[in-house]
Amino acid sequence: MLKKQFRLKKSSAFNATYRVKHSYCVSGVVLWVGSKKKPEYKQSATKVGFVVSKKTHKRSVKRNRLKRLMRESYRLLLKDGKIEGAQQFISLIFVGYEKALDKNFSQTKEIIAKLLLNLEKNND
């Protein structure tokens, strides 16, 4: 589980991230990117949110499974130090769609890694 300091929780924070309108999509998962951190806040943690809409699947078990897979994938990539490019942003939101529901853990981890790699490439 992600530590509290890394979690995006307030709806106002989610709305602020969506308002920036920068997104990347890979295999049914969309990454919404908030604005870049100001130089004085470079040491603060990047907040991350994981969303799967009720429109994606009516069963909460399926939705929560996808959120758990995305969350754990991000946590492991964070632990391995493979997401330095993402640390320059205030917030990130991963949104799962129907296409991603049937993916296993390794496929989900690969998708999250690709999204973060795209983010790093496009913001250098």
Please place each PLM-identified region on the residue numbering.
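Positively charged, solvent-exposed patches that mediate nucleic-acid binding
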Residues: M1-D124
